[in-house]
Amino acid sequence: MSGIFHLKRSGTQYMFNLKSAGNGEVVLTSERYTTKQNAEAGIASVKANAPYDARYQKLTASNGSPYFTLTATNGQVIGTSELYSSTTARDNGITWVKTHAPSAPTADLT
């Protein structure tokens, strides 16, 4: 099960999702960017930072659901996961991103 980045436009802003190519599930969502070029740089940053454990922050939402963020070397969040049902599921999500994000192609849906 590989991954794919979907680059999208919403009004005047751009964003991307990293999805499982197998089931289409969104695994990681970006912040919104003002330019397409910045969103593409965000995808490149996810690919570059995904392999490194230190770039992941394991967090818990206000409703108790575990999730994670992926950060760049400067500490800026470059992607936020879905909410998971357990810490094990969240950790599996991190492993999936580490494995599939670096080589995932981009589908430009703008």
Regions found by a protein language model. Give the residues of each.
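Charged, low-complexity amphipathic helices and coil/IDR segments
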Residues: 1-4, 102-103
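A structural feature that tracks compact, well-ordered secondary-structure segments
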Residues: 8, 15-21, 27-33, 42-45, ...
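A generic "cationic amphipathic patch" detector
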Residues: 29, 52, 102-103
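C2H2-type zinc-finger recognition helix
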Residues: 36, 87
